[in-house]
Structure formats: C-alpha cells, structure tokens
Amino acid sequence: MKTLRRLATLAAAAGAAAVTAVGLAPAASAAPDPVLASPYLYQWGGQTSASAAMSATDVKAFTLAFMLSDGGCTPKWDGTRALTGSDATMINQIRSAGGDVIPSFGGWSGTKLGAKCTSASALAGAYQKVIDAYQLKAIDLDIENTDEFENAAVQDRILNAVKLTKQKNPGLRVVITIGTETTGPNTWGKRLINQAKAIGANVDVWSVMPFDFSNGGDMAAHTKSAVDGLKNQLKTTFGWNDDVAYRHSGLSSMNGKTDNAGETVTVANFKAIRDYAAGHHLARFTFWATNRDCSGGGECSGISQGKYDFTKIVAGYTG
C-alpha cells in the first residue's frame, strides 16, 4: 500500500545512528495549531530541513513521522532513535522559529506500539512518554498497517488508550489518520469510528489518506468524494450535522506521484483540494511529505513542480 513510506522507514532503520540528549523547549503558548496545517516531515531522506521549509514557505507546523515500537512497548523514532537527540533538536528549532509539531505514531512500515503494547494502559503509557518528552498539544495516530487497522483487538486497545490519554491530558488533541476508499472509510474504518463512539474515546479529528486508489483519475474529485464519505460516516455515528462533521474531518494527501502507477496529485489538484477543505472548514489539511516537495524523480515528487509548491499551499490554509 504505502510503498514510499515503507521504503523510507526501512532506510531509516538501516542507517539510524546514536544521538545525544538535549534540553527541549516547551511549545510556546502562542504557537500555531499543530493539527490544522502541518505537512509530514521525516528525518531519513529528501528535504529534511524544517528550518529551510519554514523560511521558504512560512509554514508553521509539521507532522513528524514516525513514532514506533522498539520491539516492545517503548516509543522510539522509527523504532530506533531515543526521544532525545536529533529529533528533539529539530523540535527545538521549529519552536524557536515560532512553530510547533505533532508527532505521528504508526505509518505503514515498522513495528507498531498498538500491536506490541499488551494493554490499553501500557499503550497510553507509551503515548504519555512522548507527550511528556515534548510537552505536546496534539498527537497523530496513523493507523494504516494491517497489524493495527485490520485487527479488532488492536483497534479497541488503541481507542481505550486514547480515552485514558485524553483523561490524563484534558487539553490534548488526538488525530486518527486512516486509509480510505473513494467513497470514504472501508469496513474497518467504519468499525474504528463506531468503536470510538462506543468506547467514548473522544477523538478530536478523523483524517483520511485519499490516495493509492487505482491507476489514475481526477485526484481532486476522488479526494472530495472520500472526505464526503468520512463526513457522512461521522454524521451517522455521532449524530452531527454536516458542518460539525466536516469540522471533525481532515485529509492527508500525497504530492505528485503516489504509490500506485499512473496516479498523480498535481499542484492544480492540490489547490482545488485546499479550496474544498477551506469551503468545509476541515480541521486538518496536510500531505506526505515536505521531504518530497521538489521537482523530478528520486526522493522528489516525480512531477514537474516548484520547490515547496505543496508546502506553500498548506502553509496558507487557515481552516
């Protein structure tokens, strides 16, 4: 499914180096909302400089990928790097420049905390270590790997851990990011949403990844249809009206060529998606990833585009 994410994470695991501890600055009280407009950024390839992206685009927040299991229930960046070191340094740099971050747990590749932590309380404890380490305002749970997504017991463990984490951190916002069909969440996605309601997990934002559908088509239209489907499921589950459901919805697109041959999100597509998101006041508008936000192949988007074209579009999103 998410081949580009898979390859990147495997590369990180192979090349991770030891890091040294640094002090971490807390999120500034006037810092931007890390949920709303925060493109994904990772440390293992492509354009990894948060400072360069902020200077070039005026983007103020990043979704940092990925927090994984070290083989047990201990959270580490890409499953290898401690919570101190280069990642903490980057968070300090982002905050010093007036920005903020939202770490993402999960992704496609690597060992997942949801699967390795044997209870909801243990998983909540793993989340708490990261929240405390970075004094976070929000976390993103990217539940796309089958070990977590297509597993009822793990889905419930994650949702119960969210409930416990929200109780301990009343101001924390939790985003759950899942894959989608063009019509909205599939059976497993619908189950996850319904279980969140049943458990009382109090998820703040539900975000779908509207790509890897097929081998082409109008990606702006596919994205709108997928998010409309998410909105409809939230209406059904929670009894919200359209406006409230949209304001609990979000999307995480992909710039340029996706993992599926022939499927491409162009800059024009992404602008249309931005306009749709703004028109419905979506709570989250992002993409994978600033690292790839450059022209051509290799570790770039695979299309002809200006450097940081997609990040600039996200930077201008105000909800």
What are these regions (language model features)?
Residues 67, 144, 211, 254, ...:
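Flexible loop residues that form catalytic
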Residues 56, 60, 133-134, 144-145, ...:
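Outer-membrane beta-barrel proteins
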Residues 62, 103, 141, 206-208, ...:
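Conserved, mostly hydrophobic/aromatic
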Residues 50, 86-90, 119, 123-127, ...:
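Stable alpha-helical elements in mature extracytoplasmic
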